[in-house]
Structures are given as structure tokens and as C-alpha cells.
Amino acid sequence: MNKSIAPATSVVAGNVKFGNALPLSVIAGPCQLESRAHALEVASALKEIATRLGIGLVYKTSFDKANRTSAASARGLGLDAALPIFAEIRDHLGLPVLTDVHENEQCARAAEAVDILQIPAFLCRQTDLLLAAAATGRIVNVKKGQFLAPWDMGNVVSKITHAGNSKVLVTERGVSFGYNTLVSDMRALPIMAKTTGAPVIFDATHSVQQPGGKGTSSGGEREYVPVLARAAVAVGVAGVFIETHPDPDHAPSDGPNMVPLREFEALIKTLMEFDALAKKRSTVGAV
């Protein structure tokens, strides 16, 4: 490992800049990569919305949902099929792309076509995976495990910076509160900003997830996504992570907590208003 370096206070993915004191940016897209046509449909719609609103947007989707509740659940198209789709979205639509990785060997290949590698919450302490992601030189977004205290993320980030990569994002996505339930502690946002020094993202859709709550799949309460998103942005964050879908009720995964695409623009517009107020008066820069 290299000598530890400090995480960057702002990171740039394509034309999108994340920083706790900078204007709000968005990471958005469907839970999983369903098809090329579906991915391009959603990405095109999101680009139009972001352009109208004047906000930076990173497209996200998963080529493999490797931690589904049931072995029978749909997992996605896989990395081989995903890479040309990711490249098309990035190169032809001009949107930076984020996807999650689950195995060390996936990192270098995924990095060929995406701007941000995401470490899933369940894997956030897997040292070798963090190092493999860091070694690509891409931005690494680490989801805080539902089992971790926010101050524990300092050790997670230090694994990446010890590998010589200062481009880190940390994401809050709720903490376990009894069985099949997550809650959001808004104190975690400034705590992670202070402890890690990295830009902080709030995942508003997975925070309303009910893990395993439907027996063979996870449930969710999407009606609370706007509530938690407004609260997080009022605290002050670098960005929000929001999964969205044209027809969430028929999505292959995480439908109960995804925001319908038709409601996405109004939500982001409101969050931008909250963000402007929070950062105008914040003394914590922003968290």
C-alpha cells in the first residue's frame, strides 16, 4: 500500500462535481440493468430532466444484483452484456455512469465503461474489494453498511486512500432497526463528512427499503422517499441517490422503494430549493 493520502473534498465524474459545499448533484437510474432499450429510455429521460433543471446527474444501474433475497430472483444482464450499454450511455448520451461491483475481478473490467465504482453496503468492509476498486483510479462510492456506525466509515475510506486513490464518495442508506426495518439517522451525514473528509451522498430510496420484508423479496415504502430526501438535503449533502423507474410496480427488483419516473423531476426541483437554502446559511460547509 502507498502512504495514506487525504480523500478529495470534491470529486468530478464527467461533467458532474460532488462536494459537500457545492450545489446538489444526483445519482439516479433503475435498480438493475433490464435491457439496452430500457436503460437508454431511462437515461435519455433523466438527461432531459437534468438539462432542464440545470443539475449534474450520474446514471446508475446494476449489471448484477448479487445479494437478492431469493435465489430465484432476477439479477440483471451480467457484466459482459452491460459493458457496451454503459459505454453507450456515457459516450453517446454524455452521462457519467455508476455501477456496483461485488468481486475483485469485476473492478478493472467495469472501470473500462463507468466513471464510478460502487461498493455495496453488505461489502463495505471487504478490504480486497475496496483495494481492487481503488486500484482502477475511478471514483469509489462506498455504501455504509446497515450494521455500521457512521464514524466507522473513516476506516473504510482509509483503505481506499492508503491504496493511493483520493476519489471517494460515502453514502448513507439507513441503519438496521429491528427485523426487516431501516431507519435514517440524519446525524450520520455530518458525522461521516467530518470523520471521512469525503463528499457525502444520501440514498433516499434504499433508506425506505424493508430488507426481506416480503418473504422472498424486499419491501419498501416509497411514499417516504421525498420526506427523507428533503430532510437529508436540508442537513446539507453533496448529492442524493434516487432509484427511479417508469413502472416501479413491475420492476424486477426494488420496485416498492423506487420513485416513478413521472414524479422524479418535481422531486429534484424541490430538493434543489432545499439545497440552495441549506448551503446559503450553513456553517458546516455544508455538512
Swiss-Prot record:
Q: What's in the GO CC field?
A: cytoplasm
Q: What class of enzyme is it?
A: transferase
- InterPro entries assigned: Aldolase_TIM (IPR013785), DAHP1/KDSA (IPR006218), KDO8P_synthase (IPR006269)
Please classify the protein's predominant subcellular localization into one broad category. Answer: cytoplasm
Might you name a Gene Ontology BP term for this protein? keto-3-deoxy-D-manno-octulosonic acid biosynthetic process
Q: Please provide the record's keywords in A-Z order.
A: Cytoplasm, Lipopolysaccharide biosynthesis, Transferase
Pfam families the UniProt entry points to: DAHP_synth_1
Do you know which SUPFAM superfamilies this protein is assigned to?
A: Aldolase (SSF51569)
Catalyzed chemical reaction(s) = D-arabinose 5-phosphate + phosphoenolpyruvate + H2O = 3-deoxy-alpha-D-manno-2-octulosonate-8-phosphate + phosphate
Q: Where in the cell is it found?
A: Cytoplasm
* Functional pathway: Carbohydrate biosynthesis; 3-deoxy-D-manno-octulosonate biosynthesis; 3-deoxy-D-manno-octulosonate from D-ribulose 5-phosphate: step 2/3; Bacterial outer membrane biogenesis; lipopolysaccharide biosynthesis
* Sample GO molecular function, one term: 3-deoxy-8-phosphooctulonate synthase activity
Q: Give the EC number.
A: 2.5.1.55
PANTHER family found in the cross-reference section: PHOSPHO-2-DEHYDRO-3-DEOXYHEPTONATE ALDOLASE (PTHR21057)
* Family to which the UniProt record says this protein belongs: Belongs to the KdsA family.
Q: What is this protein called?
A: 2-dehydro-3-deoxyphosphooctonate aldolase
Upper lineage ranks?
Answer: Bacteria, Pseudomonadati, Pseudomonadota, Alphaproteobacteria, Hyphomicrobiales
